[in-house]
């Protein structure tokens, strides 16, 4: 079942509005201190299921696109971000080979079924330039068990292995897989000082203690 735009508005507001400022600060650190290794300032980037724009507002890129169905998203996006207000598994309004990177955070598990996941992977690959990357961050059900279903709009259960396999089936080349990266959610977690967030990112051994989200970096083949 796909959530309607009105339902998404209610879900986002209930779940994220209270921590919006904190989330923005965390993503400033994540984008500049970690994800910038794959996304250069001259890149054209699309944020898939962008939410309130925490990633796309903070990443340094020449051209920024965002895609989401939530009708509230425009009020949260920076002025340099162009929004596609649509179902991410429907055809994208972009030409082939136009994107350097597609990023998604906690998105694929919200799609209604695995066929929608496949359609989205195909559209991302079509729009990526040869050598362009799909960077996917998401909850790893392997390490979550029942907590995965605490969010009403989680429909598709994924691990780093299953989503990585889906990417390979669609023709991507896996460059990096991190089974445990970030903690599960900021929704119910304490708001830690930013110095601790920076420390966590800098010490990968902490990921294996606290991380319950996977990170996958996959590339569109160059030939």
Give, region by region, the residue ranges found by the protein language model.
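A C-terminal cap/extension of S-adenosyl-L-methionine-dependent methyltransferases
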Residues: 165, 176-223
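Acceptor-substrate binding/catalytic loop of class I
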Residues: 147-165
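Conserved beta-strand signature within the Rossmann-like core of class I S-adenosyl-L-methionine
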Residues: 131-138
């Amino acid at each position: 079942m796909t959530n309607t735009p009105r339902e998404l508005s209610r879900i986002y507001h209930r779940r994220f509005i209270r921590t919006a400022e904190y989330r923005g600060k965390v993503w400033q650190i994540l984008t500049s201190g970690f994800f910038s290794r794959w996304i250069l300032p001259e890149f054209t980037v699309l944020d898939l299921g962008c939410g309130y724009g925490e990633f796309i507002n903070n990443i340094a890129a020449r051209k920024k696109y965002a895609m989401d169905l939530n009708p509230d998203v425009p009020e949260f996006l920076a002025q340099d971000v162009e929004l596609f207000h649509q179902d991410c598994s429907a055809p994208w309004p972009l030409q082939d080979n136009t994107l350097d990177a597609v990023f998604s955070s906690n998105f694929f598990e919200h799609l209604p079924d695995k066929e929608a996941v496949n359609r989205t992977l195909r559209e991302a690959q079509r729009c990526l330039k040869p050598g362009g990357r799909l960077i996917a961050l998401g909850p790893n059900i392997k390490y979550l068990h029942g907590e995965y279903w605490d969010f009403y709009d989680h429909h598709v259960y994924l691990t780093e292995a299953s989503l990585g396999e889906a990417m390979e089936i669609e023709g991507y080349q896996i460059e990096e897989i991190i089974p445990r990266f970030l903690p599960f959610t900021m929704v119910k977690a304490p708001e830690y000082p930013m110095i601790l967030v920076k420390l966590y990112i800098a010490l990968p051994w902490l990921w294996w203690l606290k991380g319950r989200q996977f990170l996958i970096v996959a590339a569109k083949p160059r030939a």
